[in-house]
């Protein structure tokens, strides 16, 4: 009986909080009468509704956790019983880092061994690409691009040859349409 009463009270607090929030929103949004009294009631209902709603949520959560406390304790005890036993370790002196002088000797040995393995310098690269340069080439520099006026002249010549071979159906620098283009529309 006590369980059912607590559940009903929790549901009533949630419903009351929700209704108070809805009433506060309605009073604020209703345009029929904007009296001072309605606005004061609305601004009191909104926060009060939020407080009642949140307290109902936390109350229901607490009741559910309190009802199932024995289950949580049982699961926690089982989890703690299956934990690994703590391991005893032995602290050895070689675990600590080497002295400064010893670490320098190791770096020197590693550097000299690394150079001995390679035995040849890395390949040469150009500034413009990451492709290796061929040493057989006579010209180490890539070919320079043509100057701007030359590029414009070449582009204009190719456009003229294309227009001579086949007339373009694209609209040129005017608003006049050709007769064949009008017939296709």
Swiss-Prot record:
<feature type="region of interest" description="Disordered">
    <location>
        <begin position="125"/>
        <end position="149"/>
    </location>
</feature>
<dbReference type="GO" id="GO:0016020">
    <property type="term" value="C:membrane"/>
</dbReference>
<keyword id="KW-0472">Membrane</keyword>
<dbReference type="InterPro" id="IPR031363">
    <property type="entry name" value="TMEM252"/>
</dbReference>
<feature type="transmembrane region" description="Helical">
    <location>
        <begin position="8"/>
        <end position="28"/>
    </location>
</feature>
<keyword id="KW-1133">Transmembrane helix</keyword>
<protein>
    <recommendedName>
        <fullName>Transmembrane protein 252</fullName>
    </recommendedName>
</protein>
<dbReference type="Pfam" id="PF15664">
    <property type="entry name" value="TMEM252"/>
</dbReference>
<keyword id="KW-0812">Transmembrane</keyword>
<feature type="transmembrane region" description="Helical">
    <location>
        <begin position="39"/>
        <end position="59"/>
    </location>
</feature>
